[in-house]
Amino acid sequence: SERRTARVPFNQARPVSAETMTALDEVLRPGDGEFEWVHDATNLAALKEICRNAWAVEMETPAAMHESSMLTRIGEDEINAAPDGISLSGPAMEAMSAAGVLTQAKMNDPSSFAYAETRKFYNRNIDSAMAFGWLATSGNSRTDQLRAGAGWVRLQLAATRMGLAMQPFSQALQEYPEMAEIFEEIHDFTGVRAPRSALDGRLQGLFRFGYARPSAPAPRWPLQTRLIVADE
């Protein structure tokens, strides 16, 4: 299966069933972490609020927002020159970029159209979630993190096979000072004690689920550009 990250609003007419979420859990292997999920209205509303607040903190924290905007590639020329980060393509993006309306600098300017639209874009995605799931580990060592990463891939491959769209939301799991209160809140909500050391449990991933049209593959560097040839 080809895994894709869905960065679009999900279909509001198609709920995600408990059977589907349970089937996702069954693909995990020992050591991948514990996967839990919610799809009821009350818990969905609570998690949407946490995610919206986390996104607001990121946008209102200059260093964090600057990092995101500088990793955004706008239009085919930028994407082809550096096929990584966050890609924005299509006729509308090209036109706004050419007109100077959508640029990395504008995305950093709270008074700009680009900043306002970026905020609305992510909030629409958050509000369209039909289920949320999270992956937690009992410790937070590098091994725990790597195993959880493998679990994440297994979850996404399984979701793809089921026709289910999945998108990670990492903002609430960031560890910079401005996010500290929300970091504690999301751990409290999920019943995982926020980590104080590598011995403590931690949320390793938070994801929204739903149904959407198939996503195109994200741009990637050719494999040969990432390989290092060892000296003979």
Question: What is the role of each PLM region?
Answer:
Residues 1-232:
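Acidic, surface-exposed loops and disordered segments
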